[in-house]
């Protein structure tokens, strides 16, 4: 069986709360697993669009709550964990060694809680204030964010403590993720005039670079932080523009 097939099902099993139809693992397919993150984003985007269709029958605040929580629920809150860990580490404003130690600490600090509350408020408010949603834009926001996050992990120098520290960089997986990123940014613009996925990619890239600089390395937590921030940028773009 191809490493790409293994990579897809590995990505599904690791990054989605939806039960994986085929639980398989091959260590040599780890890079392909990251490259398949955009395909996982297609699943998340599909669920998000279904929720948007259902939300039309709900009162505004409930509809906004459903849409805000949908991408978190379908991923089992996995990326929020990285978002909160990075917020705790970076906002401590301590030296590099201490920031890295806080990143690995399993306890939840005040900075993480505050940032999570602000994130939830921002995402809920964006959906509540949106007069209409581009379904193409909504569907491809998770694809753009995961393409960008995959590129960051596959190309940037990892933290020594990262599970991806021994992984080879470059190659086919990088090109696959880059093509997915380009398509997810351009297609909704051409088909529906939506800038949301493109802005998602911009937000994700900036957040990944910020986390990388602050912690002097890339990790799964930094990737989750960047993905979460990027999706917020995309949702805000949907609300205020299209």
Task: Walk through the language-model features, giving the residues of each.
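Membrane-proximal soluble regions of multi-pass membrane proteins
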Residues: 1-25
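N-terminal beta-alpha supersecondary unit
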Residues: 7-13, 27-52, 166-170
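Alpha-helical transmembrane segments and their lipid-water interface positions
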Residues: 17, 21, 79, 88, ...
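C-terminal ends of transmembrane helices
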Residues: 19-25, 78, 97-98, 150-160, ...
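Multi-pass membrane catalytic core of lipid/isoprenoid biosynthesis enzymes
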Residues: 30-48, 89-133, 137-138, 175-189, ...
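Membrane-embedded alpha-helical segments that form the functional core of polytopic membrane enzymes
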Residues: 35-87, 136-140, 194-213
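Acidic (Asp/Glu-rich) catalytic motifs at the cytosolic membrane interface
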Residues: 70-108, 211-230
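Solvent-exposed interhelical
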Residues: 92, 147-181, 215-218
């Amino acid at each position: 069986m191809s490493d790409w097939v293994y990579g897809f099902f590995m990505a599904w099993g690791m990054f989605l709360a939806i039960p994986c139809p085929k639980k398989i693992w091959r260590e040599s397919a780890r890079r392909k697993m990251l490259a398949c993150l955009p395909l996982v984003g297609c699943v998340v985007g599909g669920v998000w669009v279904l929720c948007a269709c259902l939300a039309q029958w709900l009162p505004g605040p409930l509809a906004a709550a459903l849409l805000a929580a949908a991408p978190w629920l379908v991923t089992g809150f996995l990326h929020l964990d990285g978002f909160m860990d990075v917020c705790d580490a970076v906002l401590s404003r301590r030296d590099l060694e201490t920031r890295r130690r806080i990143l690995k600490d399993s306890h939840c600090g005040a900075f993480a809680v505050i940032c999570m509350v602000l994130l939830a408020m921002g995402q809920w408010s964006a959906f509540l204030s949106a007069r209409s949603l581009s379904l193409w834009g909504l569907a491809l926001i998770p694809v753009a964010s995961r393409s960008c996050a995959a590129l960051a992990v596959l190309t940037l120098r990892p933290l020594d403590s990262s599970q991806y520290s021994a992984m080879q960089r470059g190659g086919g997986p990088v090109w696959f993720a880059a093509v997915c990123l380009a398509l997810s940014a351009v297609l909704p613009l051409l088909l529906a005039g939506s800038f949301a996925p493109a802005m998602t990619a911009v937000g994700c890239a900036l957040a990944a670079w910020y986390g990388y600089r602050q912690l002097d390395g890339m990790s799964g937590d930094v990737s989750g932080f960047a993905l979460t921030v990027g999706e917020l940028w995309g949702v805000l773009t949907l609300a205020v523009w299209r």
